[in-house]
From Swiss-Prot:
Motif Nuclear localization signal (NLS): where in chain: 604-610
Species the sequence originates in: Drosophila mojavensis
Gene Ontology terms: biological process: cell division; centrosome localization; dorsal appendage formation; flagellated sperm motility; meiotic cell cycle; oocyte nucleus localization involved in oocyte dorsal/ventral axis specification; posterior mRNA localization involved in anterior/posterior axis specification; regulation of fertilization
Subcellular location: Nucleus; Cytoplasm; Cytoplasm, Perinuclear region
Function noted in UniProt: Component of the integrator complex, a multiprotein complex that terminates RNA polymerase II (Pol II) transcription in the promoter-proximal region of genes. The integrator complex provides a quality checkpoint during transcription elongation by driving premature transcription termination of transcripts that are unfavorably configured for transcriptional elongation: the complex terminates transcription by (1) catalyzing dephosphorylation of the C-terminal domain (CTD) of Pol II subunit Polr2A/Rbp1 and Spt5, and (2) degrading the exiting nascent RNA transcript via endonuclease activity.
Gene that specifies this protein: asun
Post-translational modification: Phosphorylated.
Subunit structure: Belongs to the multiprotein complex Integrator, at least composed of IntS1, IntS2, IntS3, IntS4, omd/IntS5, IntS6, defl/IntS7, IntS8, IntS9, IntS10, IntS11, IntS12, asun/IntS13, IntS14 and IntS15. The core complex associates with protein phosphatase 2A subunits mts/PP2A and Pp2A-29B, to form the Integrator-PP2A (INTAC) complex.
Name the UniProt record assigns to this protein: Protein asunder
Keyword Coiled coil included in the entry's annotation: yes
Pfam families: Mat89Bb
UniProt KW keywords: Cell cycle, Cell division, Coiled coil, Cytoplasm, Developmental protein, Differentiation, Meiosis, Mitosis, Nucleus, Phosphoprotein, Spermatogenesis
Amino acid sequence: MFERNQKTIFVLDHTRYFSISSEQYISMDYLKGKPVAESPGSGSSIVGTQLSKSLWTCAVESSIEYCRIVWDLFPGKKHVRFIVSDTAAHIVNTWSPSTQNMSHVSNAMMMVSVPSRSIPQSSDYSVIHGLRAAIEALAEPTDEQLQAAHAGCKRIGNKGRVICITSARDNTSMKSLEDIFNTVLIQQNALVAPPSKKGLQIDHCHLVILNIVPLGVESLVTNRSLLEISPFLNAEIHTVNAPEISDKLLHLIMGHYDLASTTVTNIPMKEEQNANSSANYDVEILHERAAHTKVCGPDFTFTTSIKPGTAYETVTLKWCTPRGCGSADLQPCVGQYNVTPVDVTSRPSSCLINFLLNGRSVLLEVPRKSGTKTTSHMLSARGGEIFVHSLSIARSAMDEAPSITDGPGGRVPDYRIPEMGQLLKMSRLVPLKTRPKGKCSQGEHLWRRMPRYFPRTANATILFNLQRQLSWLPHFLHLLVKEDMDKQDEVRCQQQIHELYKSASRGDLLPFSNSNNARLKVNKTKDQYRLFYRELEQLIQLNAHTPHHKNLLESLQSLRAAYGDASNKSDPSAAHLRSYTESPLSPERLEPTNSVNSSSSSILKASKRRMSGCGQRSLLDIISSAERSQSSKRLDFSGRLCTPLGQTAKLYPEFGNKDKEILTPGVIPSSLKDESIRS
């Protein structure tokens, strides 16, 4: 409920060191006067008066800018306090909402002023006083924590963050500062422990130390990432130049409060010097990161970039010219978040803020390489606050659900939704008030038996499509799923099956409706009854738990055999498995029919005998033996037969021998004739 960023305390070092210059000079060229003489050894001259901020001014301005962003984005939700430390700790504001505003903090900081350089160097001036006061301030409850305590909350979370802006000599001094802070934190938790209960116990504290040095001065303090000092304390150290402390705090605040940066580009603004012309400007704004993460869509990515001088990414969104559009053109909003500009004093930011506060809205679109436009966000103001609205790019929850017919398998417009609802009602299990003594196997039996066969679509079943046309079929199906079928129910079902057989013998068509008949595309009477019998047998097999069910199944199988559509009884387990996985309207398996002649039957039987005699031989063994039997009928290569093992046979041993007698074409030597005769 209370996160670590709920409480943030700035501890500002107000010692003599912070009165020195930051060494970043600002040229005041608008002041009239003689140019300053060119400094020796430099190739440039500075026109006008030059000013430089002190370390104290840089620290105060950047910390106040930090709290401005927090209060703009989380008004009344996140709290920031300031403590100034010199010879003692000076409390600037409290957790009270009346002091959590910019005017109170600014007026108090003006009264503190810059540290005097005439202050004598003394050990009494230390930032440790402020760190002690910061730990005590973390133990004080906020209004939200007090309300939770009054509401009866037993465990109130209390976490916080302390940002200390100081300057240390080396790593040893910084380590000593961390140890003192950790010791004081443990002592404070011991003071508020029961039974005293003087405040809240600090569950965890995040200490951020910013070591400030003037521009161009190297520090002996090294940067260090987040490190766990104790179970109650994590600390990190950053060494930055005084002019860059504002950018550093801007980078830190994005991680502290999970913020994101958005740069609105191509904002048309008129020039101050020439009102007839306009130029495009960019404005960077901050908001919660969820404003980007809630925008979803297929293959949707934001264009990000890193601005010069910063270490974080910013999302680039393009200004969309305001235009009048109806409600049909607006996308639904999936979230709204407060917005604040990064540079609140710049002219482009001021123009954008005034434009929005005057009641105008701005649409922001994602730039695409393909040239298409995708509007993802909208800026608008209400009640003096500016919000960014995340627009739904994908389908909204308020839109109609996508048609189930547009699936990857094609159009399926006839899902059996009412029948599925009835099946769910039949399969519903209600918990018992008292625990049964025996095993509760009835629910498990129902779970295994009911949903095994359920055609999802109307065009995948014949049996269930005929329930409205055949008056006896609903009652017949009800008797099939009964667990306690008696002899009378069996006789009724037998009668209905025989009546169905008589209808098939007369050649009566099954009473399909026009729509079902068009979908099923089964026009032959024999095909209709064959599919009907197959599905009926499949349903009876799943419910054959009593002798009456088994008798009914045998009767139907004999009827199918008489009709010429007998099932294969040689492998009952395979047939039982196919009853779960196949629909009666699936493509039929190749089965021998009565029209097959005796010769083809004998061939099949002979092939079966040959295959059965193979035993456990694999397909590779069968193919290898067939190749060996074929190769044994031919003589092998003479070179392989005459050459000893391990040697290579020469293909043409007499090639190139000049002494060999040259045979005349068309004349056969007598020796060859004799060999041919003897052979």
